[in-house]
Amino acid sequence: MTAYRGKYADELIANASYIATPGKVILAADESTGTIGKRFPSINVENVESNRRALRELLFTTPGALPYLSGVILFEETLYQKTADGKPFVDAMKDGGVLPGIKVDKGTVELAGTNGETTTQGLDGLAQRCAQYYTAGARFAKWRAVLKIGPTEPSPLAILENANGLARYGIICQENGLVPIVEPEILVDGTHDIDRCAEVSERVLAACYKALNDHHVLLEGTSLKPNIVTPGSESKKVTPEVIAEYTVRTLQRTVPQAVPGVMFLSGGQSEEEATLNLNAMNKLETKKPWTLSFSYGRALQQSTLKAWQGKEENVAKAQEVFLARAKGNSEATLGKYQGGAGGADASESLHVKDYKY
């Protein structure tokens, strides 16, 4: 049997292609209630449903921002929320030409027999949840696997376990009409250099695509959300041009050209770093059969949060900041970013060790 072609095949291919539209990006707004709770205290905002809804409305209704977005990844709570005037967020997105997506994993747990490595939960009942999310308006999904670099990590067991989990998630999504975004995140934590990150990234991505093929996943109806290949957080920094060369080479060696788009995660880079690295990749003159874009959460929202401060009178200012970040990253997908979007706050490091959504 080759790739699975069920009743949603044509829709999956069309939506995966749309997600990868050059000049458009994905906003990751799928932070769990707990993760939002870690960010709100920095701006003295209480972590309650009304404030979470207000932040999401600020983002989703920013004038002029939706044309820069192809999709928004939502937390389950947000999928069913509405704007202040009663319009479902899902409808507001669709009216603006943006595909709603949904985080479907249930977080990570320690993988027995390893040195603190993890596997991702959420396969139980996933088919039923995907069917419900499709009915609610979602058209793509996200599942995050997490690997770390250490003296002997990631272990072959952790790589295999997480690759198979991503593949099982992928085929279940496709059977229920959702484009699976495959996210094998290799954490930036550590003292390793960029060569070590590239080597690990190649092994992880090769294992993922072996598993996706073994599970008959239709690659044309998927998207990849990998880490950018960088030195570890405690290692010496390198230029965006070096990062671009290593990252694109890693993709060339591992990612089939049937995959329409690669939507990088920011992995705790500052907003400006993440944008400059993406821009350098798109300026690189080499074989790139996939659209190179991003699915950023922290790297699109941090400056916006600081401008908002949870206050109604700051919404317009915060939306201006969000629009500037969205526009800047859109330009970076075309290799046309000039730098400076978001002001001084955009250069602040967003790294959180052992980051959990």
Swiss-Prot record:
Gene3D superfamilies on file: Aldolase class I
Record-annotated active site: 183, 225
Enzyme Commission numbers on file: 4.1.2.13
Record field: catalytic activity: beta-D-fructose 1,6-bisphosphate = D-glyceraldehyde 3-phosphate + dihydroxyacetone phosphate
One Pfam family from the record: Glycolytic
Site residues by UniProt (Necessary for preference for fructose 1,6-bisphosphate over fructose 1-phosphate): 357
Chain positions recorded as substrate binding sites: 53, 142
Membrane listed as a keyword: no
One of the GO biological process terms: fructose 1,6-bisphosphate metabolic process
UniProt keywords, alphabetically: Cytoplasm, Glycolysis, Lyase, Schiff base
GO molecular function: fructose-bisphosphate aldolase activity
A single Gene Ontology CC term: protein-containing complex
InterPro entries recorded: Aldolase_I_AS, Aldolase_TIM, FBA_I
Subcellular location per the Swiss-Prot or TrEMBL entry: Cytoplasm
SUPFAM superfamilies: Aldolase (SSF51569)
Top EC class, one word: lyase
Entry keyword tRNA processing: no
Pathway(s) this gene product operates in, as recorded in its UniProt entry: Carbohydrate degradation; glycolysis; D-glyceraldehyde 3-phosphate and glycerone phosphate from D-glucose: step 4/4
NCBIfam families on file: FrucBisAld_I (NF033379)
Family according to the record: Belongs to the class I fructose-bisphosphate aldolase family.
PANTHER family from the UniProt entry: FRUCTOSE-BISPHOSPHATE ALDOLASE
Name assigned to this protein: Fructose-bisphosphate aldolase, cytoplasmic isozyme
Organism of derivation: Spinacia oleracea
Lineage: Eukaryota, Viridiplantae, Streptophyta, Embryophyta, Tracheophyta
